[in-house]
Amino acid sequence: MVLDTKRSLKIKIDALKRLEKDYMLYKKEEQLQIENVERFKADETKDIYDVKKQIEILDENKTMIIDSVSRVTAFLVQFSEFLEEHKNEDDGSEIWKDSYDIIDQISTKFLGE
């Protein structure tokens, strides 16, 4: 049972890291898209449709950021509940320390989002 729990912890840690990575990529893409919109607006040779399309892409990206924050938040709750349910199996191993560390790190990062 303990090995299954440790395996589950490893999977959950990796999943949480992936969700964080997705969020960071969307934030990076947002910055690039903001620059694109500004560049398209400043370029008089660009058609208004092109500018509108870039704004639409930016809006979609912002939606994905909101979605990724909600996915991270939901997973943090689920992961915290999992840790609480299995706390009697905590043997002080590295995987348990990593679990608590990643939850603290990502919770702190996403509190203000």
Curated annotation (Swiss-Prot):
Keywords associated with the record: Chaperone, Cytoplasm, Cytoskeleton, Microtubule
Annotated Pfam families: TBCA
InterPro entries according to UniProt: TBCA, TBCA_sf
Entry's Gene Ontology BP terms: post-chaperonin tubulin folding pathway; protein folding; tubulin complex assembly
Record's keyword annotation contains Nucleotidyltransferase: no
Subcellular location: Cytoplasm, Cytoskeleton
UniProt KW Cytoplasm keyword: yes
GO cellular component, one term: microtubule cytoskeleton
Gene Ontology MF term list: beta-tubulin binding; tubulin binding
SUPFAM superfamilies attached to this UniProt entry: Tubulin chaperone cofactor A
Subunit and interaction comment: Supercomplex made of cofactors A to E. Cofactors A and D function by capturing and stabilizing tubulin in a quasi-native conformation. Cofactor E binds to the cofactor D-tubulin complex; interaction with cofactor C then causes the release of tubulin polypeptides that are committed to the native state.
Family named by the database record: Belongs to the TBCA family.
Function of the protein: Tubulin-folding protein; involved in the early step of the tubulin folding pathway.
Protein name: Tubulin-specific chaperone A
Organism: Dictyostelium discoideum
Encoding gene, per UniProt annotation: tbca
